[in-house]
Swiss-Prot record:
Class of the enzyme per the UniProt entry, highest EC level: transferase
Changes after translation: The phosphoenolpyruvate-dependent sugar phosphotransferase system (PTS), including enzyme I, and histidine-containing protein (HPr) are required for the phosphorylation, which leads to the activation of the enzyme.
Family the entry assigns: Belongs to the FGGY kinase family.
Protein name: Glycerol kinase
The organism of origin for this protein: Listeria welshimeri serovar 6b (strain ATCC 35897 / DSM 20650 / CCUG 15529 / CIP 8149 / NCTC 11857 / SLCC 5334 / V8)
Gene (UniProt): glpK
Length: 497
């Protein structure tokens, strides 16, 4: 039987999905399973690692049954995962010693405060490209070792293993034969030197993490090990591709050249720009991260996040009841020529890159007696585009690379008004692909390259299909006037504390 399909596993924050992708890069079938969110205390978020694993087994079975494709036809498995979420488990039994601590969880704030107090910020920044924040995996591992009796001692003896979700899934799928991660996930731990490409002794000492518990770091596209037959319907199938979700989306968008960038419009926005084989150190509070490692070399990316994007549209729907469903926002915004000087600064939880102001709160400016809900809705949508320009401008400043085109995905990328305004306010075209499942595609492409379904990146590029290209329609003078108004609004919001 010909092995012509790739199985892509997308292990996310609220659910796990499995998709089968054919040689043309088309999604043949999908299965999805949600799992419980655990909130032990305010600000803490945990998952059961065993429940995540059970959900993965369920979606693998589900997608094969749904598509009537045999496990014998699967050429390889690609994995993409919620980044930073951390698991520590017993090497012998395979049982986690504590829940997985999720990327959103703030329970390691005290560890972060101590690192800042001890003056580690510059060391961490210069070696990892990251900031000291509970977001990243290293402090989560430290917390588990501190809070589970005897864990530190057992870790030092080599009895415990650490991993992000990709590592946990590969370990389980291969029956414990492979304890590995890829470059993109390793670069989110605070423990990995992204320049020397190795676990860093100084960083390990700083958090007192025993080297014995760390996975081997491997390329993002490579056959790591085969599944054990009892986990894959009697078949040994190569696990052959891994990337963290945002890097996988960059790959799935075909952003292979230096200077190509993508924006994922989800609850927040994640912007990544490929900076090629050179790591760019940001002067604007952006993260420097490994994009992927393929063909014996690594490529880097700059990353910026916007805290509030799609959630601002949800706020219009659920909080203000201005729209019945999120998609209605496009119709309202398109009815008027402009937002008539109204600006919404959706700083509901502070502002992310490049402002990094956690104290600022949401604000609305420029209201008059003539302001109607159309202007309010339009200004809210426009705020997503302004924030995107803020981050991309910071990326251009840091990298010295001018953006030629922005590729987009995620829920709000379906909003034609927003995408046109995004192009206008950036002054570059915006491209939306036919297949919005770019994260899953990225994992599939990485695995398919390793097992020979696709020959090289050039072949993959052909499978990126354009849905719509939004060309710039706004004159530069108008663009700069609008953007100047946005900056005034942000400054005014920051002054109101």
């Amino acid at each position: 039987m010909e092995k012509k399909y790739i199985l892509a596993l997308d292990q996310g924050t609220t659910s796990s999905r499995a998709m089968i992708i054919d040689e043309e890069g088309e999604v043949i079938g999908v299965a999805q399973e949600e799992f419980d969110q655990i909130f032990p205390k305010p600000g803490w978020v945990e998952h059961s690692a065993n429940e995540i694993w059970a959900s993965i087994l369920a979606v693998i079975a589900g997608v094969l049954l749904k598509t009537n494709i045999s496990s014998k036809e699967i050429a390889g498995i690609g994995i993409t995962n919620q980044r930073e979420t951390t698991v520590i488990w017993d090497k012998e039994s395979g049982n986690p010693i504590y829940n997985a601590i999720v990327w959103q969880s703030r329970q390691t704030e005290d560890i972060c405060k101590q690192l800042r107090k001890d003056g580690y910020e510059d060391t961490i920044r210069s070696k990892t490209g990251l900031l000291i924040d509970p977001y990243f995996a290293g402090t989560k591992a430290r917390w588990i070792l501190d809070h589970v009796d005897g864990a530190q001692e057992r870790a030092e003896k080599g009895e415990l293993l650490f991993g992000t979700i990709d590592t946990w899934l590969v370990w389980k799928l291969t029956g414990g034969r492979a304890h590995i991660t890829d470059y993109s996930n390793a670069s989110r731990t605070l423990l990995y030197n992204i320049y020397d490409l190795e676990w860093d002794d100084e960083l390990l000492k700083m958090l007192n993490i025993p080297r014995a518990m760390l996975p081997e770091v491997r390329p993002s596209s490579e056959v790591y090990a085969d599944t054990v037959p009892y986990h894959f319907f009697g078949e040994e199938v190569p696990v052959a591709g891994i990337a963290g979700d945002q890097q996988a989306a960059l790959f799935g968008q075909g952003c292979f050249e230096k200077g190509m960038a993508k924006n994922t419009y989800g609850t927040g926005c994640f912007l990544l720009m490929n900076t090629g084989e050179k790591a760019v150190r940001s002067e604007n509070g952006l993260l420097t991260t490994l994009a992927w490692g393929i063909d014996g070399k690594v490529e880097y990316a700059l990353e910026g996040s916007i805290f509030v994007a799609g959630s601002a549209i949800q706020w219009l729907r659920d909080g203000l009841r201005m729209v019945r469903q999120s998609s209605d926002s496009e119709n309202y915004a398109s009815r008027i020529e402009s937002s008539d000087g109204v600006y919404v600064v959706p700083a509901f939880v502070g502002l992310g890159a490049p402002y990094w102001d956690s104290d600022v709160r949401g604000a609305v400016f420029g209201l008059t007696r003539g302001t109607e809900k159309e202007q309010f809705i339009r200004a809210t949508l426009e705020s997503l585009a302004y924030q995107t320009r803020d981050v991309l401008y910071a990326m251009e400043q840091d990298s010295g690379i001018s953006l030629k085109t922005l590729r987009v995905d995620g829920g709000a990328s379906a909003n034609n008004f927003l995408m046109q305004f995004q192009s206008d306010i950036l002054g570059v075209p915006v491209e939306r692909p036919e297949n919005k499942e770019t994260t899953v595609l990225g994992a599939a492409f990485l695995a398919g390259l390793a097992v020979g379904v696709w020959k090289d990146k050039n072949e993959i590029k052909k499978h990126w299909k354009l849905d719509k290209r939004f060309e710039v329609e706004m004159k530069e003078e108008q663009r700069e006037d609008l953007y100047d108004g946005w900056h005034k609004a942000v400054k005014a919001a920051q002054a109101f504390k």
